[in-house]
Amino acid sequence: MPSRRGFLSLESERGVTARFALLSGLQEFAIWLPLPVLVLHMTDRGFDLAAIGFAFAVRAVLVVALEVPTGGLADAIGRRPIALVSQAATFLSFLLLLFALGPATLMLYAVFQGIGAALHSGALEAWYVDRLKALEYEVSLQKNLATIGVAQTAAMLAGAAIGGSLPALLSGSELPWPLSGFGIALFAGLVLRAFVMYLTIVLVEEPERRGTQRLAEALTTPAVVRDGLRLALRIPVMPYLLVAGAAMGVATISLETFWQPIASLTFGADPETSGVYGFLGFVLGASGLLGSLAVMRYGDRFPGGPAALAGASQVLKAGAMILLALHATGAGVAVGLGVAFFALATQNVPHDTLLNEAVPSERRSIMLSINSLVFFLGVALGSSVLGYVAAQQDPRLALCIGALFTLVTAVAYVGVALAARPRGKELVAEVSDEA
């Protein structure tokens, strides 16, 4: 398939970024359509916070088990086939959740979510970064990743606002089950996910491989995995980035799981009043967009570089989580959510920049998968332990614990700043030569 010229050309920085921004933005839109009411959909179907937390923990454990092998497979056989299988598994998971009535369906949702998440992490981002680095001129990775972040958070903003409002807007339409209640938001996300799979086939161009070639390359996966694990230990910045990634997992799952139950203490949890969740979804989406825009515009000028920016964002995020937990009024929820998601955006881009700059192209997917692995270890910890705390005590207490953990691990970025990156690149070459 010939590369498209003009706006989506693979021969220019703008074209490569536009292509990935379109794909990742629509994918983010599909994710966020159901997300503002996802936990409410589960509780509406009869699941309590302990069961929901357990399901999220199952998802995280599966990601932990599959993350590294599937990352190695993406490096071995190509990023597009892995991305497509990931999208299909995630599509099936939300289809199951749409029809969920009992624990078995909820667990199947968690299983396919875990498979999809494990396959997803790193594949398309690795394709994008490699395409950028293959250009004939030098580009700013942090600025381009921030541009992608803008596209993703703009899509998140639209998805959260629309998905959070759909149940209220259509509450008088007498939709059939399972579209009634909060189900309509999940259905809208499913439709968009199908379109994203089509776009992945069209936009993610890779060299054609025959079946025998794919099989031969798949057999190299164990060597790729071994190489990646050795790099994770020997590149100086990697241990610190992995600690920060785990903390990011705890914070993210705490926010995603507990903000809706905390908000429901003030606003209630009926589909007819879901418009407020659409507004809150707009707030968190707009805040994430502002964070990405701030990094795109000023990130390269932040004193201390990407490590300092990520560390400061971690501290800000912890403070916002505590604010959200301790001030569950309308204003407290909105401000806490807004600042927390602003800080998530301003942490993610420099973190990803540090990671991508530290690893070699031929091992990019496996290294991104290892980063995702520790992220989901944090998700597993946050889902299981904090889910139990939320069910037995209060979701506000669980969120405070997540915030304190986030605050403590902010020091990981101090280690990143002190690590000798030039020596890390020499070690990359040494380990690659030994493989």
Describe the predicted segments one by one.
Residues 88-102, 315-328:
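C-terminal ends and interior cores of transmembrane alpha-helices
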Residues 180-182, 189-216, 415-428:
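Helix-loop junctions on the cytosolic side of multi-pass membrane transporters
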Residues 4-65, 98, 103, 236-284:
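Helix-loop boundary and gating motifs at the non-cytosolic
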Residues 2-14, 204-242, 433-435:
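Juxtamembrane intracellular "pre-TM" segments in multi-pass secondary transporters
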Residues 111-152:
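Cytoplasmic helix-loop-helix junction between adjacent transmembrane helices
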Residues 39, 44, 97-99, 156-186, ...:
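Transmembrane alpha-helix termini and helix-breaking/packing motifs in multi-pass membrane transporters
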